[in-house]
């Protein structure tokens, strides 16, 4: 049993509109399993009887944190299997729907006379904080 996200930056992280995919294999043919991802039924469950894939798109109403799941199934005779609630390969996904915010603290130049003015060849330094860990930001000043 494996669970990953289609997040561009990290398959163990998810945000709103990312798809979470659970893939699993049964030891014998089973009827179409019932799968929940984040407490909500999977958008799709498909398979060939022993190899299965369940997918769900995360929404703004999902709970942040480690995404929990359940897999319930019956064999072809109708015997219920033991509910699965954990991966077998240590994969997992953390859902984050909080948009990071940036707060500007200061912009200063190395101008010898005034640190709030800059001329050609002066260097500018911008210091800011974010409300959570972020990737290295791309900073543009004056459209450059």
Labelled PLM ranges:
Residues 1-2, 86-108:
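Flexible, low-complexity linkers/stalks enriched in Thr/Pro that connect modular domains
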Residues 7-18, 112-122:
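Short, solvent-exposed loop/linker segments at the N-terminal edge
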Residues 19-24, 123-128:
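A short beta-strand segment in extracellular, disulfide-stabilized domains
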Residues 26-32, 129-136:
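Short proline/glycine-enriched turn/loop motifs at strand-loop junctions of beta-rich domains
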Residues 50-56:
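Short strand-edge motifs at loop-to-beta-strand transitions and within beta-strands
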Residues 58-66:
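Surface-exposed, short loops/turns at beta-strand junctions within beta-sandwich domains
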Residues 73-83:
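Short, solvent-exposed loop/turn segments at the edges of extracellular beta-sandwich modules
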